[in-house]
């Protein structure tokens, strides 16, 4: 019989259509933007810069080593290192990025920049609502827009953020013990 497969498929569709009216768990759509689907822990969109203090410029973890810029496959990261040094979030004088831009129109969200960063300064964001009023405003994201607090990072990736903070605290304790021993 030629139409048996079509009838079986239509039966499955009708069963799911009718069943979704009686069982709320079977609904797959949500009323966006009032309701939002939960994003998984490992969801990633575009890179952000993490800072640890109240001031995004003073607490930025990035020391402008340019490893992420060199390793980026589409070469969408643009960094200019500062001429002077400022104390970082741990009080150690470090260089900082005078300019840190990411061309979002070129970025392919591969997360290589996150993997190669030795300072845990660049992470992937979960924000996917990137619309702007002007056509070209969303293409190039500057340091001010990329900078997000460590608290924000804890909200979007709680497990990974706790691991990173524990590793950074351990490194700070080891550095303090080494300084005390010397």
Question: What does each model-identified segment do?
Answer:
Residues 110:
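Basic, alpha-helical nucleic-acid-binding regions used in initiation and control of genome expression
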Residues 1-106, 115, 120, 124-182:
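Non-ligating segments of multi-cofactor redox enzymes
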